[in-house]
Amino acid sequence: MERHVLVVFPHPDDEAYAAGGTIRLLTDQGVPVTYACGTLGQMGRNMGKNVFANRETIPHIRKKELKDACEAMGIKDLRMLGFHDKTLEFEDVDFVADKIEAIIQEVNPSRIITFYPEHGVHPDHNAFGRAVVRAVSRMPKEERPVIHAVAITKNREAVLGEPDVVNNISEVFDHKLTALGAHRSQTEAMLEDTHAKIKNKDAATLKWLQLEQFWTYKWE
């Protein structure tokens, strides 16, 4: 069993989309999970399907949504790092890595889940993935936690190969949907479409709710 898992993503809802089922499987097994969330996603364009947020209220709404999503996934240790949404690419990578390294030293994880650098599509995703790698690279090789990274670029398999970690989350997909639903301001319309596709047994949607895949980060 894993000693401790550290999840590091820049935005509320990244964790639910990318690893919500995997996280729930871990917490159901009694594995301690810490989530370091970089921002409150305050620059997101979605304000709810039937608009209920504005630029002033969205940070507070998304903070509450994040806490509710963590509850659905069984996460009891949530760290909000306080960076500003859509600016992580402009932060000094060592400064961000310092924040992450401090948490690594505190919780001593055996595994870290984050975005694969340059395969996160969004600049914040790539910046946070780079910062995680920088933080872990400072550790002696024999002490480094394994990094299971999420890759969402279209050419990911051509560049990285097939994912070497594929988790069957079918027994907890309802918790993944609950976590996604907690991020209502961002996901309400998407989930209505998802539930319709589930009802119609859409193959791609059913696969998405059954499997989560990761690439073990390869050190140079």
Curated annotation (Swiss-Prot):
It catalyses: (S)-malyl N-acetyl-alpha-D-glucosaminide + H2O = (S)-malyl alpha-D-glucosaminide + acetate. Zn(2+) binds at H11, D14, H125. Its cofactor is Zn(2+). GO terms for molecular function: hydrolase activity, acting on carbon-nitrogen (but not peptide) bonds, in linear amides; metal ion binding. It is an enzyme of class 3 (hydrolase). Its EC number is 3.5.1.-. Keywords: Hydrolase, Metal-binding, Zinc. Belongs to the PIGL family. PANTHER family: N-ACETYL-ALPHA-D-GLUCOSAMINYL L-MALATE DEACETYLASE 2-RELATED (PTHR12993:SF27), N-ACETYLGLUCOSAMINYL-PHOSPHATIDYLINOSITOL DE-N-ACETYLASE-RELATED (PTHR12993). Involved in bacillithiol (BSH) biosynthesis. Catalyzes the second step of the pathway, the deacetylation of N-acetylglucosaminylmalate (GlcNAc-Mal) to glucosamine malate (GlcN-Mal). Has weak activity compared with bshB1. This is Probable N-acetyl-alpha-D-glucosaminyl L-malate deacetylase 2. The gene is bshB2.
